[in-house]
Amino acid sequence: MSINAVDSKKLVEALLGDLRLLSQEAKKKQNHVKEAAESGVVRIRNISTASVGDTVLITNLRAACTELLHPLVLSCETRHTRLVQIALQGIQRLVQHRILSQNGATIVTNELWSLVEAECEELRVLQTVPPLVSSELIVTGNTLAKCIVMCFRLHFAKDPIVINAASAAVRQLVSTVFERVIQEDGIFSTELTVVNPSGGRPSPRAAPPTLRPCAADAYMLFKDLCLLINGEAPIWLVGIQETTRTLGLELLESLLKGFPSVFIRHTEFGDLLKDDVCPLIIRLFSPNVKAMHISSQHPSSRTSNASFNNYPPTISHERQSFPISMRLVRIVTLIVQFYQTILHTECEIFISTLLKFVDGDRKGWQRPLALESLHRIVSSTDLVKWMTESFDCRPNSTHVLEQVAIGLSTVVQQCLVCTTFSSDQENEIDRSQEDGGPGFLSKGLWVPYVEHLTSKKTILLDSLDRMDAVAIPEGYVLSRCCVALCDMTQAVYAAIDKLCLVDENSEAGSSETKLEIAKVAYANSQPSILAAIGSLLAASTDEIVSDQLLCCLSTLISAGCRVGADADLHRSVYVLAIMSLPSPSYLNQFAGIAPPSPANKRDAPVSEQVFDLEAWPSTTQVTASGPPCPCPVVSTELWNKQVLLTSKNLQAARTFIASITTHIKELNNLWYLCMATCEHLSWLLAMRPTQVGQFERETRDDHSNVPTVVTNAALSDIAMLSSLMDKVAPAIAALPDKSFLSVIDALIRLSDESLAVAATGRESSLFPLAVLYKVCSLSLMRLQVFWQKAANHFIKVCNHTSVSMRDWAAVALTSLAKHAVKSKTSMDAKSQQEMIISSLLALCSIPHIQVRRRQLDCVMSLMQTDGAFLLSTSWPNVIQIISAIIDSDTECELSLVRQGYLGLRLVSSDFLQSIPFDCISGLVEAISRYSKQNTDQNISLSALTLLWTISDFIYRKMESVGNDASEAVWMVLYTCLSESCVDSRFAVRKSACQTLLQTVTAHGHALRSAAWHSVIWQIMIPLLDKVRSQTRCASTEKSNGELIMHHSRDTEQKQWTETCIHTISAISKIFNSQRKSLLALNDFGAVWEAFLGYLDWAACYENAELSLSAIRSYQEVLLGKISSQTLNVNSHEKSNGSDSTIDAITPELPQAQWVESWKVWLRISRGLARQGCAAMANSVNADSKSISSTPRMNSSSSSLASLAPGIYVPGPSHLTAILHVFPPLFDKVAKSITVDDLKYESLPAVLESMMNVPIPSEQAPFVLPSATTHLTPTQEALLEAVKIVFVECTLSGTSLRAAIPDQIRLLLKFASMATQRISPNKVAPGGQKSYRDYALTTIVPFSEYSLRIAIEFFTSTSQNPEVANSLIAIDIIKFLGEPLYMKYTCISASTWKLAATSLMSVLRTSIPYARQNPEVFRGLWSAICDTMERWLFTPNKSTRLAADERKRDELMECQAIEIIRSEMLAYASRLPQEDVQRLIALLHRGSISQIDSTDVLDSHTQRNELAKACFDALLMSSDGAHTNTEEDEGRGILGNVAVTSLLQRCTQVMSDFCKDWSAAGDLRLPRSRILEIISALQAVDSLIARLARDPKMTELYSHLVSLFPSVVDVMPCCHADPQLEHQLIKTIKSYQTLFLLQNIPQATVE
């Protein structure tokens, strides 16, 4: 050991310190010590100074060891306490830093011995000796012995502290001695060769010469320990005066336990064990050994050996025997564990001794002590293996392993036997049960269980500090046996497992030898262990203990499987099986399964060997009760007997199922036993298998006579058992073929037993079927191995009388078939499918419905999931299975029909390509059967759809099969469909018609031309005739069927109407899709006319749906498209809008057919209008008081609140739909019709009558205007039609221009709806809001829009002679007079304003042309005067308006006055005189204020601007008072009239103003009055100025002079306004000019 620089320096300083301290302490009395210490100080300093390095320093100190020890030894010799302490401290430093040499060690040892002898500083001596010995090999031989003796002697000192320290020192020194041996062996790997001295044997008092020094010391030490234990004097440890046997045994045990390599490597030590230790132990075990107190001393001592042999006893033999025996047992255990290879016979003796202790317990602690030792032995795998190899496998040797197992088993049996039983014991049992503690209960004997026992955790073997045995807990022996047996079982299994492992490097034949050893180990231990475990398990009351025992039992089964011990395995499995069931005799009594024969024929059966039938415990918690599973081999009287299943049974059941699952490959002939046990378990726990082979708890059992009762406590266990049972089938599926078939046979045997039970009417177990199904489903890869056997059994069960068994078998067979079809096997696909499907086909002979249902389910599943894998040869069987449902006696079973049809539909939809074409006819026939059956109408309907699918398939196959073959199938298909078209059931009839017509539509082009003539005249047209006839003749009585039908289909007539609708629609599609083929027919015209005649009838039929459908079909057949207009009355569409129509090309059609279609359109439109008007008339006659049924001009403003039953009114949707046909149809026929077709009596009358059709009240709330045009769809369509006609009439070169006025008149008719008077009690259609609100949103926008279009049409064509000469302008002006007259009383103010602007537009357009043709337009001027008068002077006054609104309205009137002035009065000479007079009178009337000047409340009705405009017009018209030419003569006449009217107006204004001024007093007159009089004064100025320019106007001069007084009258009032005053002054000044002209009249006269 190297010492670093720091340690060396510290050592020098510490030594110097110790020496100085010695010098200081010894200077008074111990002068020689002082001098020696000082010399030592000097010596250390010199060494330290002279040493260059640390290593040299240590070396020099070690060389001077004797000199350094001198002062320390002198100090010890003084026996002075303080000096001795300091000296021992220094010695310890030298020992610690290994400064001592071997001589120095001897000196120190001798001095320490002297201190011990003197009893001086014993504790410090003990602190010094162990480091001295253990530091280096400087203490050997006698010196070492001396050190050990010192510690032994101090072990018996008086001070307890010293005793304890000495005890520890002894143990340390003894261990150190043997550790030296291990170190020595590591240093010297070769053997030490020693030559014996010549002439004699080695001395017995010395170590063998073959040992090295350390080994020799250890040898002598161990030998002396044996001598001391045996009470003899030691040889090497001279000086030991006394010791104890317990200490010696403990030291012996520590050496045996800690250093087994020393004893095994060195034969000398092995000889010591064999010659000294074992005989010593045997002698001490002997009952003749008496307790002795060893007080030996050194042989040289005075007491000599006599004291050894004659020691007085100090303690009792009883007390002395336990610690000795306990230590002996510990040593024995160690010897067996570590030295069995070198002490073969001795170990056998020791084990036998322990077994004897176990067999009889005379002292109360011997049996548990021996059991603890045996427990440690049997829990070792290596020891079990050694016992088997060394003893049990040898023929003439004692079977030690067997004896140990028997011994433990015997103890168990003895502990469970109660010799006496008292009431106190019974009370104790009750208390223990109440406390819930674990334990064992057998025949009234309660043995508690001591928990947490292991082989290492013991009570007696660990009592090293006790002189007496501790109190043994009650039940300790049985508990220790229980744990020992469990551990032994595990050790046996581990040993077997190790022996059975295949070692590739092992020699040939060694594997067989090992296997034989394993078999012997199992055979010798299994019977006893099984018996003991069974007894303990039966008596156990604790779940954890039972679980341990069950685990042990499972391990026995695993070991038996490993070695292939069939008989022993059978017994183990049987024991576990009967533990899982209510009683040991259950299998024999209720299942007819006899127990296995015992190993010895003279022994009782296993069930009686292991279990005491009378002592079978009943205190375990009962979890289930009920009758046993019925078995046909036992008496039926036992079927109703009640049995109890306990929680322990469930525990065992878990272990049982887990064990058989784990070791299923090794069970061989035990399949029936295992499966029967599982069957009875599942029955007793009411665990019923599910349809997929899983097990679950059944909530109730209604079929059993005595129901099974399962407590809630068992539910969790049942769930676990279910999970475990589910794992059995996968384990079976992994077996090889031979074992697999054995399991199948066992399950079939159990199933046959269940069938026999079910035949008696009792419920039987489904367990065999479930497991058989599950096993087969997991083994489909070897289908050929089991299919025939399993399938035949399932088919057999399918024909059984038991419903549940039958259903289960059907489920199993069909499920297997579904999975087997796609499984990969060694068979070819054809053979595999034939084998599987033939099994399914065999089920057709079974009449039971549920079996056939399962059969069909399977076929469906096969087609759905694996249809692609079905070969062509399999399809005939598949179709035959499906068809057999209708052919068999079960054809009336609804569920089967439905299920069969599903399969048929699947074939038709997904697998037509897989079916050979020659099978299509059979498929069609099968579908036809399903369509004709009366069980389920829905299936009949759906079957017709399948024919449509087949038609597609036939079409696709035409190229490959040829036209002849395909047309033959077509005709068969059409024949089948035509038969269904006349079915009495409405739905079937409807579906058949649709299918037939859709098929023709889709695939009709596949027919050749010759076939089409027959299709039309033999199928289509007759079908239409028949449908029409049936519709007319159908009953209108409501159906009394059980089904609740919608009101729209609750009569036969309604149903036939629906059929008619679908027929029309379908044939229309045929005419479009097959137009090219039909046009090729020679009689296409007749075909077209016949079909349009049918559409004409249907469109005008008194049914809304049929009528609308016919109109849409009419549109489709003409245009190849359908408008978006349906029964949704709010659908808007433009004829030229591509976004609102279905993109389609107009079908080709000859012009003659287009004209025919035009005529049909007119007939349909008239018919719809006629029906609406007739309904209106009927409604009025039925209820003249009904306000909502009063006729109106337009459908937008009229509705029918109530109709008589059966009265039909075409709705807006019908009108809109037929109007949507008009634009494209008119475009086709416009060049082929005459103008008479567009005159008012023709097309406009039709359109007007359509607007007269009332809205049914139920539809009115849903007729909503467009968000953009604010028009309803019908209104938009009508106006669109008028626009299209107008555009056509305006084209150049057209002959239809004369029809333009008729179109304008029609629009005026539409516009007149806005001028209707609204009565207070008038209600809107539908009655949801007021009529005014309804009119504002629906009527007014349409009327105004019509008026705008009419004005637009007129203004754009007014110059055309046809339009102008029609005098349509007069009609327009007259019409406009009505809204202008109504003015503010119109529904909407926008109406009269639109009329005003329209009037001005018409006047500007028509007046210039009328002036050029006065004779033609003579009636125009009076119409204008009438309209203007009605407008300007209407009595319909407005409510208060805002100022800006009033100004805007007045401005329009002023604009009209301006037009009259500029366009009419300016050309008065060309107008009739009476009309001019009316116009002047209008202007005069308009210029007069018509309000009371004192009435300020009506001041808002003043029209000052109008009055001013009229006044200005009069004024300007007065310019024509003097003319020369003929044209001016007329204007002069107008001027004179105007002047007269103007002067009258001025006079009146000034007079009224003065009068009102006087009456107003201090109040100012309105500003308008002031402006009015200013205007009058300005007019006087203007007339004076005009007279100055033309002085010849004498009449004007007279009028002006007459007016002057009125002007002067205004002067008092002129101060009212500065402007008025200024104007008055100016006017008076103007009279100067008039006065200057006073002679003009004379001049004129001259």
Curated annotation (Swiss-Prot):
It comes from the Eukaryota. The keyword Protein transport applies. The keyword Aminoacyl-tRNA synthetase does not apply. Keywords: Golgi apparatus, Protein transport, Transport. Signal peptide: none annotated. GO terms for biological process: protein transport. May be required for traffic between late Golgi and early endosomes. Belongs to the MON2 family. This is Monensin-resistant homolog 2.
